[in-house]
Every structure is written in structure tokens, then in C-alpha cells.
Amino acid sequence: MGKFNLGALRVRQNALAQKSSGKISQTPCWVDIVSEIPPATVLVRNLPQQHALVQQRVKTLPGKSRPQTVIEEREIRRIKTKKASRMFQPMQIRYEEDELRKQFFQDHPWELARPRVVLETNGNDHARYDWSRLQQRGKRLDGESVVQRQLYLLNNVPDITKGEAYDIARREFYQLRLQEDIERRVAQEEARATGAYFGPDMMQVGMELENQEYDRWKIWAEKEAEQASQRLAAFAGATGGAKEESDPAILPELEVAESTSESAQPAEIRTG
């Protein structure tokens, strides 16, 4: 059958053959079950299931006076240029929070640099949060708070758009961040007034270490450049010195030529 292995389909047949030949003393207990419910014989692989993006909105439908909760399903666009080797891989499950989270952290990349606590007590901490307000008890304010607040507005406020919900959540986030900065500054001033001393923070320490490393590298680079120039100069000087030492008779001949030229020049002038 080529690359197809049908050994699993013949497991009952092999077990009965081994029992009849005496290789095994007892018939396996699963023989009757396999005869009633045989393994699947379909060799065609089906494509993985497409997961739709489910959204909950509160909208005022035509002909209705009160807004109603509507569940919308949006199909995810398939990627046409998909490799054949990835055709049967499971499809990615997407949630509405993924798009909101991507938009927020794209607009606020420095929020990813803030330390976060990802430890949970029982895995159900989200159940006690009430996202009708942005600030939660027992949870530090971060970008995830903005995402959950925006999702709450989209799911509960009638006829609100994604941009409006994002602006509301972002405005509340900026106000709380400003309040935290003011509280931190006031606490630092009060502590200094009572004699507290604050050393450099982690960012300043890191910058100082980086400057020291740069200075060490600069000294090393200057030494390397100086040694390289000395090697080139020594090589050129050794070549010229070797030529001069190989011909010691050149210097006396040059001295004799210079003396004769000096003595001959005034004589020519007098005769003229």
C-alpha cells in the first residue's frame, strides 16, 4: 500500500491468527469490541475547522425601541498563500481582545516595559473584577485594564463604536496614570523632607554601567589602533633600513660627489 500503514486496521485479524496458531493462550478482551466498532478506514484528511470571531454588541435594531444584545460572528479571512505542509495544521483561535490589545500596545509601546505580575491564585481572578470602572482592587493598572475596559464598553453600551470605547478607556487610563505620578512625586517630597535619601534608580544605574563599558571599549580601541599603526611603521622602517645596510658603499660615494660639486661650482663662476 505504499506509505500507508494499515496494521492498525488488521489488529483484530492478527489477534485471532495468533490465538489460532497458539502464540497467545487467551483471546484479548477487546476483540469483540473492535469487531462491533472497527477503526476508521477513511484515508482522506479533512481541513481543520475555521474558528469565527464572536462579538457581543448592544444595538438598537430597526423597528425596536429598546437596544438588544446581538451576537455577531465574523469569518476570518483565509490566507491563500499557505504552504502545502501547513494545510492541515490547526487554525489559530482568535478573540476580540487580541485586536484591542494590539491597537493599544501599538500606540503605547512603553507600557510593555513596565513590570507586570502574572501570578494568579486559583486561575479565576478575573471573576472578581468589575470593569464598569477602570481601576480594580488588587490589580495594578496596566494596558490589560484598558483592553478589558474597552471590551466592557463595547459589550454593554448601546450603539458605541470601537473608537469611542477606546477613547473613553484611554482617557480614564491617562487620568489614573497622572494621579499615580502626582502621588509618587508627593510621597518622594515628603520622604525627603523627613531626611530620606534616594539613590539612582535602575535606569540611571544601567546608563552608568553602559557609559563605563563604552569608555573601556574606547581605551581598548585606541590601543589597538596605535599598535596597528606601530606595526605598519615598523614594517616600513625595517624595509628601508635593510636597503641602507645592504649597500654600505653608497654613503662614501655620495659624500665624494657632493664635495666635487661644491668645489667645481665656484670655478665655473670665476671663468665666466
Swiss-Prot record:
Chief location: mitochondrion
Chain segments carrying region Disordered: 236-272
Gene Ontology molecular-function annotations: structural constituent of ribosome
Record-linked InterPro entries: Ribosomal_mS23_fun
Presence of keyword Mitochondrion: yes
Keyword Cytoplasm (UniProt): no
Pfam families: MRP-S25
Location in the cell: Mitochondrion
Alphabetical keyword list: Mitochondrion, Ribonucleoprotein, Ribosomal protein
GO cellular component assignments: mitochondrial small ribosomal subunit
Record note on quaternary structure: Component of the mitochondrial small ribosomal subunit.
Family: Belongs to the mitochondrion-specific ribosomal protein mS23 family.
PANTHER family: 37S RIBOSOMAL PROTEIN S25, MITOCHONDRIAL, SMALL RIBOSOMAL SUBUNIT PROTEIN MS23
Protein name (database record): Small ribosomal subunit protein mS23
Taxonomic lineage from the root: Eukaryota, Fungi, Dikarya, Ascomycota, Pezizomycotina
